[in-house]
Structures are given as C-alpha cells and as structure tokens.
Amino acid sequence: MLTDREIISTLEMLENENLDVRTVTLGINLFDCASHDPEIVKNKIFSRITHLAENLVPICDRIGEKYGIPVVNKRIAVSPIAVVGAALSSSQMVDIAKTLNAVAEEVNVDFIGGFSALVQKGIARGDRALIEAIPHALTATERVCASINVASTRAGINMDAVLLMGNTIKQAAKLTADKDGLACAKLCVFANIPQDIPFMAGAYLGIGEADAVINMGVSGPGVVKKAIDRALEANPDLDLGQISELIKKTSYKVTRVGELIGREVADNLKVPFGVVDLSLAPTPNVGDSVGEIFQSLGLRSIGVPGTTAALALLNDAVKKGGAFASSRVGGLSGAFIPVSEDLNISEAARKGYIGLDKLEAITSVCSVGLDMDAIPGDTSAETVAAIIADEMAIGVINNKTTAARLIPVPGKKAGDNAYFGGLLGQSTILPVNNGQDANRFIRHGGLIPAPIQSLTN
C-alpha cells in the first residue's frame, strides 16, 4: 500500500525534479509495403503510417496534460527498411528516407527510426543498398534515424560491415560539414540490437513484433540524483548497499509512471502495449544529467577512478527497481552516456576527466557507452571502424547490447567544440590515439567468430 509520503515524493518528482516520459514510440510493421516498384513502396508506407499514427501526438499531449506528466518526444519506429526495400537501389532507398521524413512531418513526430539493416552475419543486396544510401539519406532529411547491427554473440562480428560503416560515417560527416557532421548524430552502430528500442537513433520494429505496438522510454536522472542527495543529507553514513536500495525504490516509482502513460496511450490508439525501456536518458539541461549522479555518489566527476563501479551500481539498481514495477521491461534498459547530450558529461570531457578510453571501458556495464562522441575530423575511416569494432567486441563477448554513435567533425581537432543543437547538445572534441594511421587489422575483414559460451572469463 502506498503511503502519503510516497505519493508526495512522486508529485515532487514531477514538480521539481524533471520527471517526464522521455518518449512514446509507436512501432509500425511495413513488411506488406514491399514491392519492386519504388512508387508503390513509398505510397504504401505513407498511407500505412498516416493511418496508424495520425492521432499519436494529440493523444500523447492529452494524456500528458491529464496526468500532469509531459511526454517530451513522440516518435515512430518502422520495420527495417533494408528488408522492406530489399529490391530497391541505393538511390531509391534515399527516396524512401525522404518519404519517411515527409510522413513524420505529416503526423508531427520528432523522429522516425527504422532506416536500418541487420548485417551481423552477412550483407544482403538490400542491406548494402541501404548502407550506401545512409549518408545522402540522413543529409537530405531531418527526422530520419538509422541503425545498423554489425555483430551478435551468436554470429560474431562482421568486420566487412564494420569497415563499411567506418566509411559511411566519414561520408555522412563530410556531407554535413557545415553542421559539424550532424548526419552522424542520427546513425548508431550496434551489437546485439534489441527489437523494441523506443530511443533514437536505434529504434526500429523487430521482425517478431506485432503490426503496431507502443514502446515507452522513461526519464529520471534528475529524480535519482535528488533522491541520493536527500538521503545523504539526512544520513551521510549510508553505505553503497543502502544507496542501491534507494535508487531501486526511485526507479520503481519512475517506471510505474511511465507504464501508466504508455498503457493509456496504447488503449487510446487501440494497439498493444509493448515495453518500458528503463534507460536513464539525460538532456543538455541542468538538473537532468546522468553525470551529476556520479558527483552525488561522491566522485569528483564522471571519468575519475570509481566511475565504472558507480555506473554498475546505478545501472543494476535501476533495472531491479524497474523490473519489480513492470512485467513489460525491454529495449536497452541501461544507462546512456551521451557526451554532447549531457551537460555534466560534456563539461567532464572539456576538463579532461573523461575520454574515449574510459567511455569504452564503462560500456562493459551500460548499454551505450560511446554515444554522441565528437572526434577529430581527420580521423581515418579505418580508425572509426576500429573504434566501432572495439565497442562491438565488448557486447559480443559479454552477451549484451553495445552501440557506438561517433561524429568525426570535419575541419575540427581535439579540444575544439562541436555544436549540434537542441537535445543533441554540444561537446568538446575528444582526442583519438593514432587517429590518422592506417589500420591493417581492420582491412583484413571477414568475420570474427562467435565466442565460446562455456568458458566465460
């Protein structure tokens, strides 16, 4: 039974601690839109999405107003376009991306994800056409997001796909050089990608999903920080086990709020409710930062020794509390460490507390460790691919999701600033070791085999 104090604390989260529903994402199956004729594909896609999503934004706004809980982003995720458009050329794939952007504008959603391909074991014709289309597609559109899965624990790491993505990222950055490589901010490379991610840029509707489904992403880093601050102010001698328990209880409340909104949106749209993603997602705003939680836990800054252990504690406690609150937990459900999107982490990078090496290390205990990382524009495609390969290896060996969202900023070097705007924020450009050197290891290509599962050390 809820106590008066628990109800009041939840109201305080809404009033003073930046608690919101970060995203309501409507997944839409587009497989029956496939055709050899690109005009048929485009018309079917536009018709299907407008039919299912025309009321998404007004329903989210109405329910958010009803409960006093803002739904910050309304988004759409579609079936992997590499499969839907398997018969199309790369130039036709660009046209499909423009159609997705047009329909996103029509129904007034913030982003539409699913310009995606799954190439962990091999690259089919449609996959290659889509990957080749990505630089021009993301340059020509504002709301389309792309994700490519290049590795899995069962298949290994497709190094041909990894190198291809290194070149793709470099080309996308070049085409948006006047915007500090902005196209790359809408492109994520994955290992073990889940099929029900509500967050961008990784969202797509998996092959095993329904025709339409609502997936939720809750927020709450500011809520967690304030809860820790209050508890330590009352009792500075709390041990880490007690702090973990506190975070768990806070996560429970946040998740219940998210599921309440998600289920009501799904009921109003007459589609099934899918999952709540428990990921702590920051914004560039003060008081809505994952990085600030580390300082509340007693670290000088994210990136100093103790960071990985603190993140492990935080991530695990959030999952435990969320899993108790809902039987429908999914997506990434692991903390994001997006350098440019988190004001505190961006400042830590500027001061030199955190760099690529530490960000890669903490990926072992979270889902997206190399996220929105600006790197020097002269970093070679092979080096970009090598960074991705390192990130994929952590996910494959540890049987977990990992992802990389790297932005080589044209014309800028380590220590300069990159500006992306809005929720994407800004960041100091991180140095890369031997960034311009050739990398023969990456050029070998092929498949790094799937790891043995019985010997896990």
Question: In which residue ranges do the predicted regions lie?
Answer:
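Anaerobic metallocofactor- and corrinoid-dependent redox/one-carbon enzyme cores
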Residues: M1-N457
